[in-house]
Amino acid sequence: LYRISQESQNQKCLLLPVQENAEIANIKVIADNKQVKAFNVKLAKDHVDYYVPLYMNEFAGLKGLALDIHVNGDYSKEGLNALTCWENMKFSDSFDMKNREQYRPVFHHTPVYGWMNDPNGMFYKDGVWNLYFQYNPYGSQWENMTWGHSTSTDLVHWKFQGAPIQPDAIGTIFSGSAVVDKNNTGLGKGAVVALYTSAGENQTQSMAYSTDNGKTFTKYEGNPIITSNVPDFRDPHMFWNEDIKKWNMIMAVGQHMEIYSSDNLKDWKYESSFGEKYGNHGGVWECPDLMKMKVRGTGKEKWMLICNINPGGPSGGSATQYFIGDFDGHKFTCDSKPEVTKWMDYGKDHYATVSFDNAPNGRRVAIAWMSNWQYANQVPTQQYRSGNSIPRDLGLFEYKGETYCSVVPSPEMTAARSKKAGKKLTASCEMVVNLKGNATITLSNDKGEKVVMNYDAKAETFSMDRTKSGKMDFSKDFAAVTKAPTYGNISQLRIFIDKSSIEALDADGKMSMTNLVFPSKPYNKVTVKGKGKYQIYDIK
C-alpha cells in the first residue's frame, strides 16, 4: 500500500516509472477506504524506459488517498522490495510532454504520450474537428482502454484535450461513435452523444453525452443500453438517416454486422444483419461505418458499408474492406457477388477507418489508424505509439461495371503545403509526381536504406517495397512488398512522407497505399525512372 499524504496530493501528478518488458502491476486508487480508480501499468523492475503521470486533480477533495499496488510475477519479499520502481516513483508539479522521438510525425495526429489505436467518436462542430481515440494514458502499449481526445481547426495540426471518457465498473472503454444531436431527439439540442463498447466480462454498449461540445461527458445512468452474450459485440457507429428520419446504428458482431434503428439514441431496435459469406472472413470484423454517397459522373447515389478486419488484410494482418450497395434504413443489400472483396487501402498500415459525423458541405472525411496489429505494440518508439493517417475525402466511382470507393487527400492537405515547390526531399513533405506511363520512384538515404515504388501502367498495378526501408528487426511481419490495383491509369501520384510513414494516393482517388517505415536517418534522395516529373512541397 503506497500512501499519499495531503501535501503530495496538492502536487500536479505522481510520476510512475515504466519498463516495457516488465510484468503488469494492478493499481487500485483507494480513498475513504473505497476504490475510486483502477488501472494496469508495467512498473519498472530493473530500469526505467519512461514515466507516465497519474494526475492528482482526479482525486480532488478525497481523503485518505492510497495506491494498492499488486505486482504480478513470482517475487520473494526481498525481490519485490528491490524493484526499481519504488525509488523512482515521485511526485512532480509538471510532466514533460516535449517530443523526444525521432519518428514522431509532423502533420499526422499522434498521442502526446501513451498508446493509441482506433479513431473513435469523430465529429465536426462549430469549426472544430473532434477526434477521440483508443488510448492508454499509463503506457505506450495496449492496455487500460480509455477515450483520448484531440481537436483541430484544419485537420493537420492537433491539440490534445485529455481523456474525457474513462473506464468504470461496467468495463474499459472500447471503440464507438459520436453524433451531434441537431434534432434534439433525446439529450438537449446540439448535445454530442457518444455510444461506445463497455468491455467487461461481456461486451455491452453504453452511452455518454456532452453539452460543452465534447470536452466533458456525462455517462447515461441507464448504462449499458444494449447487451448480448456474443463475445465480439462492439464498435457501434450511429448516424442520422434523413431517408427514414431516424437514427441508424451499425455494429460489429463476430464476423458480421448488425443494423439497428432508434428515435431517441437511447432505445435501439434490431433491424437486420449483413455479412455472412460476403467479402473476406480471415479475421474478426470490427469498426464499421455506413454512409450514402454520390457516384462520380452519374446521377446515382449508393451506400458504402465499411468493415475493418483483423487479420485477413491483402498484405497480412489488419485492413479495411468495404461493400457497395443499397440501404433502406432497415437492411443493407450488397451489389457485388459474395466472393468479391474490395479494399480501401492496400498498404499494411491502414486500419479502423471511420468518418466524421456532421462534416461540412456533405463531405465524407475519414481517418485511419496507421499501424497493424501484427506489430503495433513493438514499433521502435516509446514516448508514444501509433499515429493516424492523413484525412481523406471519400467518394464513389465506377470501373468496368463495378462501383469502388475513391480516396483522395482532403483539401486541407493541399492548404498545408509550403508556397514554393522544389526538388529537395525532406523528412516531412508531399511529393507530387505527374506520370505518363510506367515509373519507378525510389526514396533513399546514405545508409543504403530505401523504399521503392513501382507503377505498371499496362498491368494497372502500383507497388511499394519496404524490405530495405530501415529498422525492421522488431517483427518478422514488417518487411513487405504491398501491391494494389489502380483501376485504370494514374496520371498524378501524391506521396506524403512524414518521418515514419509513406502514403501514396492517386490524385483521382482510384488507389491508396499506406505503409510505416523506420529509416535510421531520413530519406534525402529521390530518383524517378520513367516518364515522370515531380515537385516537393514542405508541410509543417
Residue ranges and their predicted role:
Residues L16, L67-H70, D118-Y138, F160-A163, ...:
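Hydrophobic core segments of beta-strands in well-ordered, beta-rich domains
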Residues M293-V295, W303, P311, S315-G329:
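Acidic, glycine-rich loop-and-beta core segments that form the ion-binding/anion-interacting portion
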Residues L1-K37, M56-S76, S92-F95, G297-T298, ...:
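Beta-rich accessory regions
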Residues Q35-L54, E78-N120, G139-W142, H157-K189, ...:
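Surface loop/turn signatures of beta-propeller and other carbohydrate-active proteins
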Residues A25-N26, E78-G79, W142-T146, N202-A208, ...:
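Structural motif
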Residues P111, D126-L155, D168:
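Aromatic-lined carbohydrate-binding/catalytic grooves of carbohydrate-active enzymes
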Residues G148-S152, S206-N213, S261-D263, S318-G329, ...:
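Beta-propeller blade signature
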Residues I24, Y138-S140, P167, G171-F174, ...:
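Flexible loop/turn segments at secondary-structure boundaries
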